[in-house]
Amino acid sequence: MVCFSSLFVAASAIAVVFASPVDHEQLAKRQSTPSSQGTHDGYFYSWWTDGGAAATYTNLAGGEYSVSWSNGGNLVGGKGWNPGSARTITYSGTYNPNGNSYLAVYGWTRNPLVEYYVVENFGTYNPSSGATARGQVTHDGALYRLFESTRTNQPSIDGTATFQQYWAVRDVKRTGGTVNMATFFNAWTSAGMRLGTHNYQVVATEGYFSSGSARINVAGGGGSTPSPPSTPSPPTTPSPPPVTPPPSGGGSCAARWGQCGGSGWNGATCCSAGTCQAQNQWYSQCL
């Protein structure tokens, strides 16, 4: 005799077993930090995730943040400034990627719409792979290789759009140092890679269908987007030479002890006090 209650219990157990992976995936998504932007403790921050990874982003004191991720998906976040500029940035911390990930100064411009990266470290995949080489630049004792690529109908600060990506990838990986953004802006511009009006600029950790963790502390500031040259002022009309005041003592006559004559002398030839007496061919004096 078949026990239907036993079959029901067994079927329920099987259903739970098959449902568990789906439930865990949904739970991971629910536990991820939602995308957001804003300011925290004096720094701008940006955090974006497509929801496909179990990812946690945390703003810490000052310019510090931490991030950990797993289970796939795309995510990027960090702290910095808004707007970006040609500032000198220093950063330090720990970065532990497992798979496709990179640590970079990351930012955007508008008009033209450009996403840019100065890559300081990366995981198993060089993010510039497949991009067009545009030269190289040396900065802070290391070689950075320049690349450009086009992103078609991809997420951007203006929604889904087509835009350019600019890359500068450091040959020798590091997690900590100084990045002078003016060096890279100038190098890209010299290679014909035009930037627009700056939006945000952060020292970011990005992950793509990988796992890992990072804790990064950002500092710096100052600097600015170079201003256009000012309009030169018109030349100033030279002032006339100052007029020598007349000799003191009254009228146009020389004062006592003053010169009153001599070969080539064009000044006063009379004396307001005393008499003009020749001392030699070249000099006469009021005595």
UniProtKB/Swiss-Prot annotation:
The protein's annotated pathway: Glycan degradation; xylan degradation
Keywords of this entry: Carbohydrate metabolism, Glycosidase, Hydrolase, Polysaccharide degradation, Signal, Xylan degradation
> Matching SUPFAM superfamilies, A to Z?
Cellulose-binding domain (SSF57180), Concanavalin A-like lectins/glucanases (SSF49899)
Which positions make up the signal peptide? 1-19
Q: Which reaction does it catalyse?
A: Endohydrolysis of (1->4)-beta-D-xylosidic linkages in xylans
The residues responsible for catalysis, as annotated, are 115, 206
Q: Which GO terms describe its biological process?
A: xylan catabolic process
Q: Which domain of life is it from?
A: Eukaryota
* Sequence ranges assigned to domain GH11 in this UniProt record: 31-219
GO MF terms, alphabetically ordered? cellulose binding; endo-1,4-beta-xylanase activity
- Quote the function comment for this protein: Endo-1,4-beta-xylanase involved in the hydrolysis of xylan, a major structural heterogeneous polysaccharide found in plant biomass representing the second most abundant polysaccharide in the biosphere, after cellulose. Exhibits immunity-inducing activity and induces cell death in Nicotiana benthamiana.
Q: What is this protein called?
A: Ethylene-inducing xylanase 3
Q: Which organism does this record belong to?
A: Verticillium longisporum
